């Protein structure tokens, strides 16, 4: 594919040098880790039984109240 492109443009090696990709080590501001204001909570793991109960609840209501989540988690 590059040979066809180079032959069509007639620029030879100059065409390849103009198509440089950014350096893989370059960090953009949005890529830098953010300092957390506080500690993040860890991921909650559920047993098979709890997962089954949650799935049954989600069939009726996809948004559980805090109280209902606590009941299901016991």
Swiss-Prot record:
<keyword id="KW-0539">Nucleus</keyword>
<feature type="compositionally biased region" description="Low complexity">
    <location>
        <begin position="1"/>
        <end position="24"/>
    </location>
</feature>
<dbReference type="InterPro" id="IPR009057">
    <property type="entry name" value="Homeodomain-like_sf"/>
</dbReference>
<comment type="similarity">
    <text>Belongs to the Antp homeobox family.</text>
</comment>
<dbReference type="GO" id="GO:0005634">
    <property type="term" value="C:nucleus"/>
</dbReference>
<dbReference type="InterPro" id="IPR050948">
    <property type="entry name" value="Antp_homeobox_TF"/>
</dbReference>
<dbReference type="GO" id="GO:0003677">
    <property type="term" value="F:DNA binding"/>
</dbReference>
<keyword id="KW-0804">Transcription</keyword>
<dbReference type="Pfam" id="PF00046">
    <property type="entry name" value="Homeodomain"/>
</dbReference>
<keyword id="KW-0805">Transcription regulation</keyword>
<feature type="region of interest" description="Disordered">
    <location>
        <begin position="1"/>
        <end position="28"/>
    </location>
</feature>
<dbReference type="InterPro" id="IPR001827">
    <property type="entry name" value="Homeobox_Antennapedia_CS"/>
</dbReference>
<feature type="DNA-binding region" description="Homeobox">
    <location>
        <begin position="39"/>
        <end position="74"/>
    </location>
</feature>
<comment type="function">
    <text>Sequence-specific transcription factor which is part of a developmental regulatory system that provides cells with specific positional identities on the anterior-posterior axis.</text>
</comment>
<feature type="short sequence motif" description="Antp-type hexapeptide">
    <location>
        <begin position="27"/>
        <end position="32"/>
    </location>
</feature>
<dbReference type="GO" id="GO:0003700">
    <property type="term" value="F:DNA-binding transcription factor activity"/>
</dbReference>
<protein>
    <recommendedName>
        <fullName>Homeobox protein Hox-B8</fullName>
    </recommendedName>
</protein>
<keyword id="KW-0371">Homeobox</keyword>
<keyword id="KW-0217">Developmental protein</keyword>
<dbReference type="InterPro" id="IPR017995">
    <property type="entry name" value="Homeobox_antennapedia"/>
</dbReference>
<keyword id="KW-0238">DNA-binding</keyword>
<dbReference type="InterPro" id="IPR001356">
    <property type="entry name" value="HD"/>
</dbReference>
